[in-house]
């Protein structure tokens, strides 16, 4: 199979391109950054460059759209990359007659759902620029489904694996330095995550699935997950300094973090702050029943494997806004002296 992977220099895109190449597929990657997978052909381009995407999509058997923006991006860039980029990719695939497309969305489309586990048909109520953009990108996807495209929509929870940094690099850094790590309130909320390897596997599954199975929308997340306190504690235990997850009074801590966010002095964005106050997990029953999805890894497995990978990397010399880079801690780099 000849497959085009957008966002192929990202954490998911690179892992997916490597996996597909190892399975014998001819993989072409496209990203604004340099190649991350030597086994795959690489094209430096922006997914919003419609003319270039049309050329790349020609002759493909499948397109997997992983390119996206993150909540840490400026608002106008989030919408442009997520919505306009998705339309550009799907337009190119449609014009080229690509028989199979996989669109990687997010469980952020549910906003802050009151029902857990959250099913795929739960109302989409975006609460910020990022979640609104993800909702609108799915609207675009449905437009192309209506035109006859076989299009899988995958909604993963936050995924972890080798290559992933972002906000998790802060937890890892504090753990390695022998610090306690704070959580809001008791930290007894259950936050479902997902192992990168499980996500790559389910994407491969929808590529091979019959059209009536593939042409659908699926939540994917870990089947086993504990409380945030317990999952974060596994990292502190692995660091071996005897440190603990410590509770912060939820009211004052939220007020401080929201103030720091408004002043652009903290990478902890608003929707994440709200998520940390309540359980957040989705139903994976549909993916299990129709795709045979059976996650191999728990939250604990995913976060520990990512931490172990991180400890083997040379110290970061800077920060950025992608999931491959540690995010700038801002004022929190000073606060950590208290822990």
What are these regions (language model features)?
Residues 136, 164-170, 185-207, 215-216, ...:
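Substrate-positioning beta->alpha
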Residues 79-86, 102, 133-134, 192:
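Short alpha-helix in the Rossmann-fold core of NAD(P)-dependent oxidoreductases
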Residues 3-23:
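N-terminal Rossmann NAD(P)H-binding glycine-rich loop of SDR-like oxidoreductase domains
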Residues 45-84, 92, 107-112:
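NAD(P)H-binding glycine-rich loop region in Rossmannoid oxidoreductase-like domains
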Residues 88-130, 144:
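Conserved Rossmann-fold NAD(P)-dependent oxidoreductase catalytic core, especially the SDR/UDP-sugar
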Residues 152-170:
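Flexible, glycine-rich beta-alpha linker
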């Amino acid at each position: 199979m000849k497959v085009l992977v957008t966002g192929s220099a990202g954490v998911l895109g690179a892992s997916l391109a490597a996996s597909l190449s190892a399975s014998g597929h001819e993989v072409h990657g496209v990203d604004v950054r340099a190649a991350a997978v030597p086994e795959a052909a690489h094209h430096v381009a922006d997914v919003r460059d419609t003319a270039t995407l049309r050329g790349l999509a020609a002759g493909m058997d499948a397109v997997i759209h992983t390119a996206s923006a993150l909540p840490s991006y400026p608002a106008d860039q989030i919408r442009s990359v997520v919505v306009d980029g998705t339309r550009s990719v799907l337009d190119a695939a449609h014009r080229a007659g690509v028989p199979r497309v996989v669109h990687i969305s997010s469980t952020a489309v549910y906003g802050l759902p009151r029902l857990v586990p959250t099913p795929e048909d739960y109302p989409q109520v975006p609460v910020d620029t990022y979640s609104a953009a993800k909702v609108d990108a799915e609207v675009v996807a449905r437009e192309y489904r209506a035109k006859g495209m076989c299009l899988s929509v995958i909604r993963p929870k936050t995924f972890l694996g080798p290559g992933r940094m972002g906000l998790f690099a802060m937890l890892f850094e504090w753990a390695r330095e022998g610090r306690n790590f704070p959580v809001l309130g008791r930290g007894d909320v259950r936050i479902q995550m997902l192992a990168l390897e499980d996500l790559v596997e389910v994407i491969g599954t929808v590529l091979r699935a019959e059209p009536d199975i593939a042409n659908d929308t699926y939540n994917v997340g870990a089947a086993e997950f504990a409380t945030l306190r317990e999952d974060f504690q596994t990292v502190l235990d692995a660091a071996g300094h005897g440190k603990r997850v410590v509770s912060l009074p939820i009211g004052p801590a939220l007020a401080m973090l929201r103030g720091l966010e408004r002043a652009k002095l903290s990478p902890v964005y608003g929707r994440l702050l709200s998520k940390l106050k309540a359980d957040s997990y989705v139903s994976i029953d549909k993916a299990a029943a129709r795709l045979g999805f059976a996650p191999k890894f728990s939250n604990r497995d995913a976060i520990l494997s990512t931490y172990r990978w991180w400890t083997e990397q040379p110290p970061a010399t800077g920060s950025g806004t992608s999931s491959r880079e540690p995010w700038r801690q801002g004022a929190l780099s000073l606060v950590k002296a208290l822990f």
